[in-house]
């Protein structure tokens, strides 16, 4: 009797595939662990620096003990004895690591111009730095007042312009004015701070010319006078009339430039506006003529000003300085009497003890 052939179990192949899968995963895990262990014994790429860069092409990882070499970037110079190499340490760090060995390329140091001075704004003259020029009083600048140290394509530093110069200040004659003149009309060139004075010509008409504006001009800069010249013109303000009031200054029939008028209201009226007006350059009163309104003057809502008369100062209080003097005298007298009483009490006590 022969045994029946065994029927293959359909689950066996699945077990083989599962064991094969576990075997593959183990190989992958060992490879990953090996890779991680190898990477754990390496340094990452060194950090970038502003002044220096790697001499060779950077790599993703570096072995322990591996040495890298740096070089200064364009626009920087090597400063001995700082090292330009770094070593991958067992703790996965780079030592030493610093860009102190590379300094910026410097421009040539600039000298002070004649009658002027150069100021280093940033306190240095390497590329990126700026300088500012100034001239002495009585001199003006020709050229750029601010220069900057820049870098060209070859890595060399240069100033972006030529240094300026300081020239002596001169002024051409000031402008002539209509109906007037100025002093020193025969001078063709004026030095720094030299001045002229303007005046008006006599007017053949009934009203005189008034000098409106500054009477004196001086040479303030190269071909620059201190202000615009004045004008000579007729300025005539209308006769000021104040209803329910009167002038308290001298009365005149004509009021020319800068004539001053003071006003006062009649009894039973109060003034609204300024009590003083001046004849302005446009033949009008400045400020406008006030008004005198009937009735008592309204009380001001503003707090009293102590500096004005009629109000006590904070130190005076309600009773004033006289009351303060009485208080001081009373304190002095009281103190003297108190001392005398104490002395008498002490004397009586000593006599009582002797008895």
Swiss-Prot record:
Its main location: membrane. GO terms for biological process: negative regulation of complement activation, alternative pathway; negative regulation of complement activation, classical pathway; negative regulation of gene expression; positive regulation of gene expression; positive regulation of interleukin-10 production; positive regulation of memory T cell differentiation; positive regulation of proteolysis; positive regulation of regulatory T cell differentiation. Residues 348-355 are cytoplasmic. It is found in: Cytoplasmic vesicle, Secretory vesicle, Acrosome inner membrane. One of its GO terms (cellular component) is extracellular space. Residues 1-42 form the signal peptide. InterPro entries: CD46, Compl-Cell_Adhes-Reg, Sushi/SCR/CCP_sf, Sushi_SCR_CCP_dom. Pfam families: Sushi. This is Membrane cofactor protein.
């Amino acid at each position: 009797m022969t045994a029946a052939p065994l029927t293959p179990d359909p689950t066996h192949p699945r077990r083989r595939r599962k064991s094969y899968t576990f075997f593959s995963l183990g190989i992958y895990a060992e490879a990953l662990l090996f890779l991680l262990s190898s990477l754990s014994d390496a340094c990452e790429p060194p950090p970038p620096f502003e002044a220096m860069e790697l001499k060779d092409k950077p790599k993703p990882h570096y072995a322990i003990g591996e040495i890298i070499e740096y070089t200064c970037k364009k626009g920087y110079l090597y400063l001995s004895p700082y090292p330009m190499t770094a070593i991958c340490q067992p703790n996965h760090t780079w030592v030493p690591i610093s860009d102190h060995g590379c300094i910026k390329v410097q421009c040539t140091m600039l000298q002070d111009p004649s009658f002027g001075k150069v100021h280093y704004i940033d306190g240095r003259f390497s590329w990126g730095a700026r300088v500012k020029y100034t001239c002495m009083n009585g001199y003006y600048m020709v050229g750029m007042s601010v220069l900057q140290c820049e870098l060209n394509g070859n890595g060399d530093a240069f100033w972006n312009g030529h240094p300026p110069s300081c020239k002596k200040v001169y002024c051409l004659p000031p402008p002539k004015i209509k109906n007037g003149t100025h002093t020193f009309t025969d001078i063709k060139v004026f030095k720094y701070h030299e001045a002229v004075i303007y005046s008006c010509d006599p007017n053949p008409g009934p009203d005189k010319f008034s000098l409106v504006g500054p009477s004196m001009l001086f040479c303030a800069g190269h071909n620059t006078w201190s202000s615009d010249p004045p004008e000579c013109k007729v300025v005539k303000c209308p006769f000021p009339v104040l209803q329910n009031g009167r002038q308290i200054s001298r009365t005149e029939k004509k009021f020319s430039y800068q004539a001053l008028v003071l006003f006062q209201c009649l009894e039973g009226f109060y003034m609204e506006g300024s009590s003083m007006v001046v004849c302005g350059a446009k033949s009008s009163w400045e400020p406008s003529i006030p008004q005198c309104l009937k009735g008592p003057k309204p009380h001001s809502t503003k707090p009293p000003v102590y500096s004005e008369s009629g109000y006590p100062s904070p130190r005076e209080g309600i009773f004033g300085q006289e009351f303060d003097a009485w208080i001081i005298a009373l304190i002095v007298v009281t103190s003297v009497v108190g001392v005398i009483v104490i002395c008498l009490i002490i004397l009586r006590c000593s006599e009582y003890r002797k008895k």
